[in-house]
Regions:
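A composition/biophysics-driven feature that prefers long, compositionally simple stretches
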Residues: 1-188
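Active-site pocket-lining segments that scaffold enzyme catalytic pockets across diverse folds
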Residues: 174-217
Length: 217
């Protein structure tokens, strides 16, 4: 499966200029209340080139005359948090899923990035700048763009979103298969609601049948 993500990274790198780098963020689950978060869903463009579905991960890609560099940054394991939310992904697991051999720790990303930036001759940084909320919370990419402008104002910022839109416009066969499967599961969910619906039933009771069908399929 990781050949899919490798191919997608190759397609992205082919659209990037020489002496440019890309940084993509998986994102983080929004806080619901107290110590409870909403379910996490990775940034879809990050997932498209990594296959990783864990939060707080960063993908770094660079393209120079010496070749291509790929590094996936993941959180360190935390024994205390592991008891509450489970263990973090290991470096071996991250490589197995993504096909990326070079795995770093997320807390070392900014120092690694700064070191690479000033020794490699990189002239452009690509970030996924999609943002649909003027007054909403800024995305990790927008916050990182501000840091780049602050510490390296000469750097050009490119927007990855149009590149991904072009790449993902025509679906690969594996994507079509997943879409067909999603439609089949949705149909099963609707049929489950129809079978369980009764007079005077609450909406959440009917919804439960739909949600259960999706979870078990």
């Amino acid at each position: 499966m990781n050949e899919i993500w490798k191919k997608n990274r190759e397609k992205l790198l082919a659209r990037m200029e020489m002496f440019s780098a890309a940084v993509l963020f998986a994102g983080k689950a929004p806080i619901k209340r107290g110590d409870e978060n909403y379910p996490f869903s990775p940034d879809r463009n990050f997932y498209y080139v990594t296959g990783i579905e864990r939060e707080d991960c960063i993908l770094f890609l660079a393209k120079t005359r010496t070749g291509v560099e790929e590094t996936l940054y993941i959180p360190r394991d935390n024994g205390v948090m592991a008891k509450w939310v489970g263990a973090n992904m290991t470096a071996e697991e991250a490589t197995a899923v993504s096909g990326i051999e070079n795995i770093g720790w997320i807390d070392a990303f900014e120092e690694d990035f700064a070191t690479y930036l000033f020794r490699s001759g990189i002239k452009k940084i690509w970030l996924d700048m999609e943002n649909r909320e003027w007054h909403g919370e800024r995305t990790p990419a927008l916050r990182f763009a501000e840091k780049v402008h602050c510490h390296a104002p000469q750097m050009v910022i490119g927007d990855l979103y149009p590149l991904f839109s072009d790449m993902r416009l025509i679906k690969e066969e594996w994507e079509l298969e997943r879409m067909r499967k999603a439609m089949d599961i949705t149909r099963l969910g609707i049929e489950a609601m129809m079978r369980t619906a009764k007079p005077n039933q609450k909406e959440y009771e009917i919804e439960a049948a739909y949600d259960y069908t999706l979870m078990v399929n």
